[in-house]
Amino acid sequence: MAKMRSLCAPASGDYRLTMRIALFQPEIAGNVGAVMRLGACFGVAVDLVEPMGFAWDDKRVRRSAMDYIDHVEVQRHAGFDAFRSTIGDARIVLMTTKAAASLYDFAFRADDVLLFGMEGAGVPAAVADAADAAIKIPLRPQVRSFNLATSAAIALGEALRQTGTLP
C-alpha cells in the first residue's frame, strides 16, 4: 500500500494552472478517498481544508483511494485562509444546496476551484461569502443532497466538459 502524502506537487510546481477540487473540513474518510480517486482519473488536484473529521492516515481513505493515491496531487491546508492564499486569482465556485443557480446554467473556467462543504453542514457563512460564485446540482425536492463524492463527480464532469478539458 502506498504511503499517504501530505502534498504531491505538480510537475510544473504551480497549483493555479488547472481546475481543482477543494473539500472544506471533510468529515468522512471514504469520501475523501473517493474524491482523490476522481482527481486522479480526471487529472485534477485536490485541496483539503482542515480540520478534517478523521486522522489523515485513516485506512478508509486508503481503501477508497486505492493505488490512485499515487496519481493525484493533494494539498492539505491548515484552514480556509491558508487555502485561499495558495490559489491566486482562481475563482472559487461553491457547490451548495442553498444556491439558486444550477451548475448547468453556469459558465465554468478552466482554472476554477470547485469548493465542497462538510457532509453534514456545508460551509459557514464567512466561507460562502468568500466564494466568487455559488451553484447547485438540481435534484428532486423530496431529497436533500447527493453524497459528497457523487456531487464532486457530477460537478467536475460538467465543468471539465464545458471547458474542453476532459482527459
Task: Name these PLM-found stretches.
Residues 1-167:
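Post-transcriptional modification and biogenesis factors for structured RNAs
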